[in-house]
């Protein structure tokens, strides 16, 4: 270092010492005030300097350091996006609990984020800290992306048409069993009642999913204290877990205990089937025991298979439960649509004289359109994230998203835009007339990320199951499960709101999944009071 530079450093240190001496001489109240003000001064100064950069998306101004725009975004994300879109356009950034999130709204945003190169953005880096404590190690986001793609392929073996044909009667059996035995219905004892759909639908969802995907042994365990373990594990999916994945709190300890206990139970069943050579084509457990060897010859361990089973079951639990709840709530407001759906059921099922089959579900366009419209109005996840792994240029702009930022896409916001869906806030199942198919992917070229060919196009304004390499593989199972559930509801009962004038409750965005605000209750009546189920 030159003599000139050395003297500058010495001089700077003298100024720092002088400043510290001055600060220490101040009264305590003034020192506290300065310490409190400094982070705010730094935050505002940093934002002013940031705004001078023309290669960065505009940043939403915020006052509170670290917290940023967490409150408006966390409570009313779609209103927040709309306000920002009016000010900045489709591309902007905001501070969220220490993370800078770059948002790209609309179909072009879908294309930019869902079809981004693996080297550019990572879902694993964005979500692993949340999902790994719940699902377990070695699966989903706790493994290299190519491993996840192969895991999805393994699971898809249990999500074929042949499997759905087997699942439909199992799901139906569970629904009628719930109607008979649950205190929410007791349908053979009561002809009417009031039920909170955010109590009934999570229970019905896990019962039907576990019976079809995991087999009778696992389903039967849910009638015991084992059900509380699922509840404890479920509580690991909250916003606080996303921000703070590990804290010395009771619900974190219960989450970890539940993960070990549930995966241990799965492993015991796997071991038992293997020892008895009892591997058939019953469920997902059988499928993974037969087919869970990676391309490089590595086999999944029993622990990893157990963890993947948890991931599959829990990954779809919230979304399907919320969607079925929203279906019931919208139909409670629309007796005319209930009647339309009922008449369709009678036509297809010969006045309810034949058992429902998977092929029957494919011949119920109005039922599928109702599910499709519900998913449009209530995308289960209002935001989807990726962490930026290296600087990424946004096409046709001067913007570059730096490494370690996050990018955010919101198909749910696009679903509610007049530009793409006339009268977007109206529940209208006939907007899908002639387009009842469940598949949401845009047509065109296909690509195989390792779990089977899917549409490469993600520029559709309707993407309830995401897109790209992380597109949900459970779409057809969700339609099967929801279709059977709603078919039986429609044929078994009519329902409305308990109080005259009640309407569909607003969305609660404070959880990880978009849920109806409590109370979310319906009054149900059996269509045929004399009938036993």
UniProtKB/Swiss-Prot annotation:
- GO cellular component terms, A-Z: cortical endoplasmic reticulum; membrane; perinuclear endoplasmic reticulum
Top EC class, one word:
oxidoreductase
Annotated binding of heme, by residue: 472
What processes in GO biological process is this protein linked to? ergosterol biosynthetic process
Q: Identify the pathway.
A: Steroid biosynthesis; zymosterol biosynthesis; zymosterol from lanosterol: step 1/6
Q: Where is it chiefly localized?
A: membrane
The compartments listed are: Membrane
Keyword DNA damage tagged: no
Q: Which reaction does it catalyse?
A: a 14alpha-methyl steroid + 3 reduced [NADPH--hemoprotein reductase] + 3 O2 = a Delta(14) steroid + formate + 3 oxidized [NADPH--hemoprotein reductase] + 4 H2O + 4 H(+); a 14alpha-methyl steroid + reduced [NADPH--hemoprotein reductase] + O2 = a 14alpha-hydroxymethyl steroid + oxidized [NADPH--hemoprotein reductase] + H2O + H(+); a 14alpha-hydroxymethyl steroid + reduced [NADPH--hemoprotein reductase] + O2 = a 14alpha-formyl steroid + oxidized [NADPH--hemoprotein reductase] + 2 H2O + H(+); a 14alpha-formyl steroid + reduced [NADPH--hemoprotein reductase] + O2 = a Delta(14) steroid + formate + oxidized [NADPH--hemoprotein reductase] + H2O + 2 H(+)
What Pfam families does the entry give?
p450
What terms describe the molecular function in GO for this protein?
heme binding; iron ion binding; sterol 14-demethylase activity
Question: Mind listing the UniProt keywords for this protein, alphabetically?
Answer: Heme, Iron, Lipid biosynthesis, Lipid metabolism, Membrane, Metal-binding, Monooxygenase, Oxidoreductase, Steroid biosynthesis, Steroid metabolism, Sterol biosynthesis, Sterol metabolism
Show the disulfide pairing: none
Question: What EC identifiers does the entry list?
Answer: 1.14.14.154
The residue range of the signal peptide is none
Which cofactors?
heme
Tell me, what does this protein do in biology?
Sterol 14alpha-demethylase that plays a critical role in the third module of ergosterol biosynthesis pathway, being ergosterol the major sterol component in fungal membranes that participates in a variety of functions. The third module or late pathway involves the ergosterol synthesis itself through consecutive reactions that mainly occur in the endoplasmic reticulum (ER) membrane. In filamentous fungi, during the initial step of this module, lanosterol (lanosta-8,24-dien-3beta-ol) can be metabolized to eburicol.
The entry assigns this protein to a family as follows: Belongs to the cytochrome P450 family.
Name-wise, this protein is Lanosterol 14-alpha demethylase
